[in-house]
Amino acid sequence: RCCDINHLEKRYRSGGESSGIVSVVTDPATSSTKPRVLSCMQPTGDVHLGNYLGALQPWVAGQDRNDAFHGIVDLHALTVTDKPGVVGQAAVELAAMFFAVGLNPDVATVFLQSHVPEHNQLGWVMECTISFGELSRMTQFKDKSAKREQDFISGGLFSYPALQAADILLYDTNQVPVGDDQRQHIEIT
């Protein structure tokens, strides 16, 4: 289930057999009979108490009863930052936090989105099948682009729902817990 990602391995593990980060998609035909749950987090800032109580703690509590997939969605993070160079380091730190709070890579699958090429591949297919009108109606794009202080608004922010739909479809998930701000994106999927 896991592969060696050197920069994570060197920084956060002193030994062991795997880094806990996957780079390949699991075949649903050979996976568990437990419900598959996909939950992801962007590496865009410090993990706070709300992240811990609302996401990380439930992830740890559910990892034994679910076929749990937890992603560090660094490609999504690129849509909302004007400093893309910091996303890589933030992803490493978020992975360390995942493991520090108790996510067990022997039980749950943890992946770094940019290391799974199928995210971009299926994301492109989704961009080509979701209409411009559907994407234009996404309230999260309107909200986030209105809050930008700079003139630059990423095209990736506009097509974000297509990549999120690809994330979900790629892992053939049964459950995708999201907040209200993501509900429209799930409906596209």
Where are these regions (language model features)?
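Short, positively charged and aromatic/hydrophobic N-terminal segments
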Residues: 12, 17-22
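Thr-Gly-centered strand-to-loop micro-motif
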Residues: 172
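Hydrophobic alpha-helical membrane context
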Residues: 16-18, 60, 86, 179
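Glycine-rich, Lys/Arg-enriched anion-binding loops that position phosphate/diphosphate groups
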Residues: 175-189
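N-terminal Rossmann-like or analogous alpha/beta NTP/dinucleotide-binding catalytic cores
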Residues: 23-166, 186
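Short hydrophobic targeting helices and cationic amphipathic motifs
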Residues: 7-8
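Cysteine-centered motifs
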Residues: 2-3
